[in-house]
Regions:
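N-terminal Rossmann NAD(P)H-binding glycine-rich loop of SDR-like oxidoreductase domains
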Residues: 5-27
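NAD(P)H-binding glycine-rich loop region in Rossmannoid oxidoreductase-like domains
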Residues: 39-40, 49-99, 103, 107
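Conserved Rossmann-fold NAD(P)-dependent oxidoreductase catalytic core, especially the SDR/UDP-sugar
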Residues: 91, 99-151
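Flexible, glycine-rich beta-alpha linker
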Residues: 126-127, 173-195
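A conserved pocket-lining segment of Rossmann-fold NAD(P)-dependent short-chain dehydrogenase/reductase
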Residues: 143-148, 197-217, 221
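Active-site Tyr-X1-5-Lys
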Residues: 148-176
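Substrate-positioning beta->alpha
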Residues: 193, 210-230, 237
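Mid/C-terminal beta-alpha module of Rossmann-like enzyme folds, strongest
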Residues: 225-293, 309, 314, 324-360
Length: 447
């Protein structure tokens, strides 16, 4: 009797999905992938993965994906979602991320041979905590505070996560949730945002960076953690799959050490970057072009990106490798793919070259965006010198006053002590003669 287990994977053509496929195949597992019709990314799915066409938003189209041979069981890893850096509400986003998850839940409940569901959420779905506090798993996601769960994507993932947990408690769904942070590493065939940024840095096409921090995980570690959740994840529980934070400067230094990438010399303060981004967004509304930088991207650097992933380490056996190892492997993958030649020269464009910025008129957008940034005050050298001089004089006077004051206090103390000693001495002398100070004053005719 055939008793194979099928791993049903949505989002199999994505960065995380392809790595999950590869690891499952290495374990000898039977893998089936759900792919949108006419999705060009299907070419990135490894061989030996069964591909089934379907649409998350079309429930009937999912039936072939869930139907497995008689006697077989299945588990679902729901990895697919629509990702966007646009923070504004989108019906399509909600239809895919929330409505699509609802359809997956319904199918799992209608197929008794489906033993488990692992929902791939996001750390962005967890309410942000103040800086200095590590963010931990929560059990309630909806309603979400838009000030703590920022952006339409994160809010859609929060709603979908709550839907999964509600189905567990109300309908008996056997499911758990993983919350990956940002993704980094090799095998990013579609050249996503993070890989594109690294290519820009390697090519020297990023003239300046931004301050702030990321939380990025090696895609292979995220894939392993997600697969582990199938058998080790407790039903109704959530697990953060994250890493230590890293700055853009740290990343640039690692790339410089790995492949002699050009170092970025200037990093925009986040408050200034936010103002420039706001200006670029206003300009983009007029031109219809995507802004080079958004206030949402600045927020993601400025927010608290410290996550506590100890629960996943303890229960799932989740581990993270060093950023240095990930950077090394990703650079080697880029060389193997012909993206770079080993000397930091790329054959494919990263996100956008300087020439493309100029030709597309983006430079004009940046200049116009700067009009929305409050002007910095002009500096008069003579006034600046006088201000410094005045500050020095005032500081000296304070020190001088302090010294003089201390001297006077000491002097007064000596005088007071001397008078006390003198008075005691006189009293003792007169006592020997049987007189008092009053007797002496009368004898001398003094008052």
């Amino acid at each position: 009797m055939n008793n194979e287990r099928y791993y049903l994977l949505t989002g199999a053509a994505g960065f995380l999905g392809t790595n999950i496929c590869m690891q499952l195949l290495e374990k000898g597992c039977k893998v089936r992938a759900l792919v949108l019709p006419n999705d060009k990314s299907v070419k990135y799915i490894p061989e030996n993965v069964e591909v089934v066409l379907g649409d998350l938003t079309d429930a009937p189209s999912l039936e072939p994906f869930f139907t497995v041979p008689e006697g077989c069981t299945s588990v679902v890893i729901h990895c697919a979602s629509m990702v966007t850096v646009n923070p504004n509400y989108s019906e399509k986003l909600m239809a895919v991320n929330v409505g699509g998850t609802r359809n997956i839940i319904t199918k799992v409940l209608n197929h008794p041979e489906c033993e488990k569901m692992v929902y791939v959420s996001s750390t962005g779905a967890i309410p942000e905590q103040p800086h200095g506090t590590k963010i931990k798993e929560v059990s309630k996601f909806d309603p979400c505070d838009p000030k703590l769960v920022v952006g339409a994507y994160s809010q859609s993932k929060a709603k979908a996560t709550q839907m999964v947990l509600d189905a567990v408690s109300v309908m008996g769904l056997k499911a758990c949730v993983v919350h990956p942070s940002g993704i980094l590493g090799p095998n990013d065939h579609a050249i996503g945002e993070t890989t594109g940024t690294l290519l820009q840095i390697i090519k020297g096409e990023m003239p300046m960076g931004m301050q702030g921090s990321f939380n990025l995980c090696d895609v292979r570690d995220l894939a392993a953690g997600t697969i582990a959740a199938v058998d080790k994840g407790r039903v109704g529980e959530c697990y953060i799959l994250a890493n230590k934070t890293v700055t853009l400067k740290d990343m640039c230094d690692m790339l410089h050490a790995e492949c002699n990438a050009k170092k970025i010399k200037f990093y925009l303060p986040l408050d200034l970057a936010d103002k420039i981004a706001a200006g670029l967004e206003k300009q983009a509304e007029k031109t219809g072009k995507m802004p080079l930088m958004t206030t949402f991207s600045v927020y993601n650097l400025a927010r608290n990106n410290e996550f506590d992933y100890s629960k996943a380490e303890t229960e799932l056996g989740y581990t993270t490798r060093s950023y240095e190892e990930t950077i090394h492997d990703e650079v080697q993958w880029m060389i193997a793919e012909g993206l770079i030649d080993g000397n930091g020269v790329t054959e494919k464009p990263a996100l956008m070259t300087n020439e493309q910025i100029r030709e597309g008129g983006y430079m004009e957008d940046i200049v116009k965006a700067m009009e929305h940034v409050p002007a910095l005050p002009e500096i008069d050298p003579e006034k600046a010198y006088k201000a410094i001089e005045q500050n020095v004089v005032e500081t000296y006077e304070k020190i001088e006053d302090g010294v003089v004051g201390s001297y006077k206090k000491v002097e007064n103390g000596f005088v007071s002590a001397y008078k006390k000693i003198e008075d005691k001495f006189v009293q003792k002398f007169l006592a020997r003669k049987g007189e008092t100070t009053e007797d002496v004053k009368k004898r001398l005719g003094r008052k």
